[in-house]
């Protein structure tokens, strides 16, 4: 799955893990489709890179709602977890690396007050982000929500590769990526930073998410972040599978 350059860098980065993590895969029963095979192959390849990483297929109630998918969780604390439905390759490879490191105990670069704000969020929040491997605006959103899921057991986040779940894309009316839902309702679309997501969450919950001051007041205007063309949501149709991750992107997670 990974070329030699990416594999070498990932192996080095996994040396930053502080605690055991587990990759829990959910695939179709026969696992004959290409993405299921690639999911199992990717998780097995990662597990071979560190003694602190193991992988196994989910059973019974452990199985995710979508297949193929895999859940990254702390071995001793399964409440610290994120899920990828599909393959986080292309532009999302850095999101995969950060998820592995953060769940493995490597500290986030987020400000201390932001981390405390996330940990103090109340209520149950089930986020889903629809992405494509070639989307340049998706990683910021995926990584922000992954961090929130890692830090707060009341928050769950699944990143969904839209091209693999076209029926769901059609049913939900997703027209562009990234699109984020919260508890089954549309939450936002377009590129957003962590601070914007926290402010938006505080806005839609009427302040019950706690600590909006740390992220600043909610932004006025629509949920889609205005900005240069490359910050606008990207259409779902016509997206290719994307190129492999740029190795220089990995510098951001060290």
What are these regions (language model features)?
Residues 28, 50-63, 153-168:
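Thiol-based oxidoreductase modules, predominantly thioredoxin-like and allied folds used
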Residues 1-20, 92-122, 209-219:
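N-terminal leader/targeting and pre-domain segments
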Residues 154-204, 245-254:
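C-terminal, charge/polar-rich interaction regions
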Residues 224-254:
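Long, low-complexity, intrinsically disordered segments
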Residues 35-89, 107-109, 121:
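N-terminal non-catalytic structural scaffold regions of very large proteins
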Residues 72-107, 176, 181-226, 230:
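Non-catalytic, surface beta->alpha helical segment in thiol-disulfide oxidoreductase systems
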Residues 30, 87, 132-135, 163, ...:
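Short, surface-exposed acidic/glycine-rich loop or hinge patches that mediate macromolecular interfaces
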Residues 4-44, 119-153:
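Local sequence-structure signature of Cys/Sec-based thiol-disulfide redox active-site neighborhoods
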């Amino acid at each position: 799955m990974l070329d030699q350059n990416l594999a070498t860098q990932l192996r080095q980065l996994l040396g930053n893990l502080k605690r055991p993590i587990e990759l829990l895969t959910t695939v179709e029963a026969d696992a004959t489709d290409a993405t299921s095979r690639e999911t199992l192959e990717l998780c097995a390849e990662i597990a071979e890179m560190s003694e602190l990483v193991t992988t196994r297929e989910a059973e019974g109630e452990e199985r995710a709602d979508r297949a193929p998918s895999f859940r990254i969780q702390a071995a001793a604390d399964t409440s610290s977890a994120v899920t990828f439905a599909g393959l986080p390759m292309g532009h999302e490879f850095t999101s995969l690396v950060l998820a592995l490191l953060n769940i493995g105990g490597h500290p986030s670069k987020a400000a201390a007050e932001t981390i405390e704000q996330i940990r103090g969020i109340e209520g149950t929040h089930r986020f889903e982000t629809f992405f494509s491997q070639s989307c340049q605006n998706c990683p910021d959103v995926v990584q922000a929500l992954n961090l929130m899921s890692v830090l707060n057991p009341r928050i769950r986040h699944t990143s969904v590769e839209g091209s693999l779940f076209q029926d769901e894309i059609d049913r939900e009316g997703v027209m562009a990526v990234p699109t984020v839902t919260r508890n089954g309702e549309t939450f936002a679309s377009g590129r957003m930073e962590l601070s914007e997501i926290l402010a938006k969450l505080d806005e839609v919950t009427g302040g019950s998410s706690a600590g909006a001051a740390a992220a600043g007041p909610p932004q006025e205007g629509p949920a889609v972040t205005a900005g240069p063309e490359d910050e606008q949501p990207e259409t779902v149709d016509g997206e290719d599978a994307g190129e492999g991750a740029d190795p220089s992107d990995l510098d951001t997670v060290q």
